[in-house]
Every structure is written in structure tokens, then in C-alpha cells.
């Protein structure tokens, strides 16, 4: 009797483990797509375990798009880390478990931010590659001239094709949230939240495009210009989404299976519905202080903090009251660089001794 | 009975192994797109002969592709051939095809002193043809520091010698010859005598000015340098006394001539083309013609690339 029970327990634990691995590795899979395409991996490109069946089909049909998906995701994660540098949650990748990209097992506002910026990153990179002529099925933007461009400037050039990027990103990323995957429990609320936040990221990219104008010719006053529509940079997108993150709206799933503002949320904000570009979440965030496999948090142990600072990166806040250790660090760097024609840069080497505070 | 736990443990381990294997391969994947080095193509003509071979994209003028930089640089080829300053190429090339150094991210900009030197030499001549110094070449945005491209150091002349006369160091490009023609009152194909350190004397010459064809000119004295007491070398490679030169000079307020250009007569294509043009050139409308020809060129940004196919999911 006792041996049988232990057998079943082990089996159950492994199944649960597989499910959480599959879920958490979704964006890790996206990041691996270009690796597979580069031939560093024997595994067939579109059979990576994190792709859903529908996504695998899209991958087969649009193989030349996959490097853009991968790079767009990587750029998004970099921008995410830049926005949250020094915060307890800093969009870190969980290298020790071999999985890449942020892991969000709970429907927190951090998950909302991550999904939105990843979706925006993919849209951005696809649109940019259309402009550069790197994808066979799309080219320059077809957009007409907006009204705020002076009439005597010409409208032409090659604009970023955000329309195409938007459609592809929506179809490729959201298809996963619509499918019923037998390998995982179907969580309708979480899927709706993910789709909502993905769409917010894409819409923010679309709404913040603006005309880019360039002078041409030997004109002195720059009165000859050609303009086209250009996407915002990922830095700008990160900044906008960061504001949305600070004002994220809590929702819940209602009886009819739709997302709905919480009652107290609606009363407090005096509005009955969220904007299409608002981020939404369903769960409270953990404090991100301790390593917790169950909730997928890394903790702040070993993080570099700033002594005496009152902000998020200050040691009192970042270390969650556990204190910090101070280490002396000697850094060699290049200094007093000079450019010599033609063509090299000559630098001296400087030694700098600094102190680094690290959370206990 | 003991066999089952072992099998399940192996299963879990192999799953973990698969993910670890995939994740490590990621580190060799394609890097995010950023500034990059590309070879300077030969049809980026303003940089032909420059001392470096790789340029950085995007460049300082925000051109994102090589073809965009090439297209925009063609407007400036004429300025370069005008030879209005010895550092023109270094300056223009540093903007259109900036030096690319793999080990560092920062842009190598031209020094403000380089920009000002080129502007001082070229601004007036551009203005003659209706082209004010453009905003995109404004010197305000450059700084003099240790990491910028400095003006060329002039070669130190030997003791007791002075620099070559400006008139004797001209280039025989079409643009320069036509420009000098329009600024000169006297344009001759002539045999000359160097009868003093500061002057040449026309021994036997023929005017090339419109309406003055075949008018013989002789015994005209032309000063070589505008500086008083200026004596400067004018080492025209003349094989013998009968070698013919192209001589251009301006009439000064005192009625005397100051040399603008002294070159040996050549059979080279651009030289002959310019000489042939002298008879039909209208100097009053030259500036307007140049501006209009510049405006007629199709602009890079109007050459759109349209969709090659329609987007369809299934």
C-alpha cells in the first residue's frame, strides 16, 4: 500500500511540473526561434515545445517572420528590464532553472506589463522589417498623409508598416489564448486578461506613431522635405506602458465569462469601463522579496542596491529590511580616449575603486 | 515495485534537461539590431579615396541604409569637385559615412573647427549659385574635443619658402573650371613667361570669353598672389617655353589682373568639356540652372516599395 501511494504522488507531481514548465516557457520558446533558424539546434524550427498547435502552423507558414518575433521579444525584455532597474521586480530572467524570459504564474500587474510590452515588441520589429524589405509578404506602409503635415511637404518615403505588424502579432500571439490546449487547464480569465494586455501593447504602438520628415537636396532652409509615418522607439513604448502599469486596473471574471471592473474599482475611479490601452490584472502582487518557486518570484537576495537612497533601489526598500553587505570593487576602464586620423582610438587605462552594496 | 519511482524520476530529469539544452543555445542567437559597420561602397563617390573603409549605419544624417546615404550624397558631389577647401571630403564623408570602430559605440563626429574651416572656404561659393549653407551641415551641433575629426594639418613649408599660390594649386574638375570662368574677367589659352617672383606675363594668348573669340592678347602682366610682397612658387610642369596654359584672372580696382587659376592645357575629358562649355555658358543664369537641376532629381524618399503580396493568415 505505501509504495503504491508514493508512486502515484510522484506521477502527479511530475505532471504538474510539466504543465507549469510548458506555460512558463512560452516566451522562452519565442526567444529560441531564431536560434533554431540559425541552425544551432537540431530540433525542427516549428516544433519547439512552447508553441501551441495553432502557433506551430503559423510558424510553418511564415518562417521568415520568426527571427523578427524572436528579436522583437528580446528587445521588449531589454526595455522591460530598463524600466524596472533597481526595483524588486526587475523583469529578470530565471537562468537557474534554464528558462528564459519573465515568468508569471499569477495574474499580476507585472504580468500585464510583460505581456503588453512583448506584444508591442513583436509588432514593432515586424513593422520595421517590412519597411526594410526583409519580409516577403509586406513592404512600406500604405498610410495616407495625416493632416498635421504641411501641405507643401511631400508624403512618401517608406514608412514602418505597423498595420501588418499589428495583424501578424495579433494572429500569432493571441491564437494561443484562444485555443483549448489539452496539456493545460483552460483558464478563461487569464486568457482574456492576456489578450487584453497584448492588445493594449499593440494599440499603444499604433496610437503613438508620428510623421518623420527628412530634408533632402542642398537646401539651406530645409524647405524641401519628405515625410512618412514612423513608429515610436521601444524606449518611448516602455515609458508609456510604465505609466499604464502604475495605473493598471483590477478586473475579475463575471458570470457570463467576460472581464469586468471590480465594484470598488469602478466606484473609486468613477468610470464604468477601462480604456482599450489600459492594463488589467486580477491578482495582487507578491512583495517579490523572497525566492518562491510556487509564485515564480526570484527574491532580492544578491541584488545590488544603493545605500542611503530613498527610492525603490535604496537598500532599505530593495533588501526588504534584511540588510546588505558592502564589498570593495576595483574596476579597470578606458579613459582619456583620443581619436587619431586615420583611424583609431587611443585610450589610457584607469583604475577605479568603488564600493558595492549587495542585499543579504 | 521499486522500479516505478526510478522511472518517474528519470522522466522528470529528462524534461528539465530538454529545457536547459534549449536555453543555452539561445546565447548564440541573432543579436538585436543596433548601429553596425558596413563597407563603404565605391558608388558613395564623395568618399572615394578616403583613408578608412568601413562606415557606421545609421550615419550622422540619420540615413538608415547604404542606398539612402548614396542617394543623398550625390547632391554634394558638385560641392566636393568645386574644391573650395582641402578638407571638404573629410568633412562630408564624416557625415555621410562616419568612421566605424568595432570596439566602441560612440559616434566619431567632425570637430567644430573642421566644420568652420570648410564652411569658411565654401559658403561664399555656394551662395554664388543660390545655395546658402544648409541646416544639415550647421556647425553649431559639433564640438572640439579629443574624440572628433580634426582639420588636416597643413604640411610645414621648408624654411625660406612660402606656400604654393592658390591660383596654381587648382583642380581641373568641370565644376571648378566653370566656377572660376564665371568669376574671372580674363580667360586665356596662352604661353606665359615667369618674369618676376610675383608675376607672370602673357607672351601670346587667345581669349576664351564669349564674344571675344580669337581676340589676341599679349604683353599682359598678371599678379600671382593677393598678398603684398607675396612671392609664391608656381610650379607648373611646363616642358618648354611653348607649352600652353589655361590662365584665368580677375581685374582689380586698380585695373591690374590677379590670377585665379593657372593650369597646363590638358586633353582630359572633363577639361575639354569645360572649355567647350565656355562658349555657351551664361554666367548670370548658371546658379538658377544648378538649383533647378538639383530639384529635378527624383528623391530617394519618393521611391516607395509597395507590398509584394497581400497578408493572409489562412
Curated annotation (Swiss-Prot), chain A:
Keywords: Developmental protein, Disulfide bond, Extracellular matrix, Glycoprotein, Lipoprotein, Neurogenesis, Secreted, Signal, Wnt signaling pathway. Palmitoleoylation is required for efficient binding to frizzled receptors. Depalmitoleoylation leads to Wnt signaling pathway inhibition. Disulfide bonds join 80-91, 130-138, 140-158, 213-227, 215-222, 289-320, 305-315, 319-359, 335-350, 337-347, 342-343. Residues 1-37 form the signal peptide. The keyword Secreted applies. GO terms for biological process: anterior/posterior axis specification; anterior/posterior axon guidance; canonical Wnt signaling pathway; cell fate commitment; cell fate specification involved in pattern specification; embryo development ending in birth or egg hatching; interneuron migration; motor neuron migration. One of its GO terms (cellular component) is extracellular space. Disruption phenotype: Anterior displacement of the nerve ring in L1 stage mutant animals. Defective ALM, BDU, CAN and QR neuroblast migration and irregular CP and CAN axon growth and guidance. Double knockout with cfz-2 results in enhanced CAN migration defects, but the same QR neuroblast migration defects as the single cfz-2 knockout alone. Double knockout with cwn-1 results in ALM, CAN and HSN migration defects. Triple knockout with cwn-1 and cfz-2 results in enhanced neuronal cell migratory defects. A lipid is attached at residue 219 (O-palmitoleoyl serine). SMART domains: WNT1. It comes from the Eukaryota. PROSITE patterns: WNT1. It is found in: Secreted, Extracellular space, Extracellular matrix. Belongs to the Wnt family. This is Protein Wnt-2. It comes from Caenorhabditis elegans. The lineage of its organism: Eukaryota, Metazoa, Ecdysozoa, Nematoda, Chromadorea.
